[in-house]
Amino acid sequence: IQKYVGNEPFLMTYGDGVCDVEIDKLVEFHKSHGKLATLTAVKMVQDKGVLDITKDQAVRAFREKNASDGAPINAGYMVLQPEVFDLLDGDSCVFEKTALVELANLGQLMSYVHTGFWQCMDNIREKSMLEKLLAENKAPWKKWERTIPEIPDYAK
């Protein structure tokens, strides 16, 4: 994708979560600090890898947490400068274990703290819960209008 990005900042997300982050505010925050990368941070009560964040929102490190930790996690919505491609070692690298860690070590990774809705979709239970919210027109991330399909019986 590097050839399509050119010299412009770009947005990247993982495909396993949904949220109602205001993209324009995320991009505005990214432009305000002059670093190479901004990730969206959310607080949640789950076992996930968490972020050590300074008072000025710089990400200093990544670590594992337990459910009662309370530390924020990477929600997977990012704004990146094209220089981030220099930190990638081909298609086989794991972005969050290589580039994001290196960016944090270099002091080039900032966090945009999101306090709204965020939900991972790592298993069928979470997928079904999100589909139910969508079908019932209670999906906080839904900012568009469209006809919502019925939930299949297996997903209820």
Task: Describe each model-derived feature in a short phrase.
Residues 1-9:
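Active-site nucleotide-sugar/metal-binding loop of Leloir-type enzymes
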Residues 9-11, 18, 24-31, 44-46, ...:
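Catalytic-core segments of class I nucleotidyltransferases/pyrophosphorylases
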Residues 14-15, 39:
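Small/polar loops that bind or transfer phosphate-bearing groups
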Residues 33-43:
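A short, conserved acidic/glycine-rich loop-to-beta-strand motif
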Residues 50-51:
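Extracellular disulfide-bonded cysteine-rich modules/repeats
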Residues 54:
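Extended acidic/charged loop-beta regions that coordinate divalent cations
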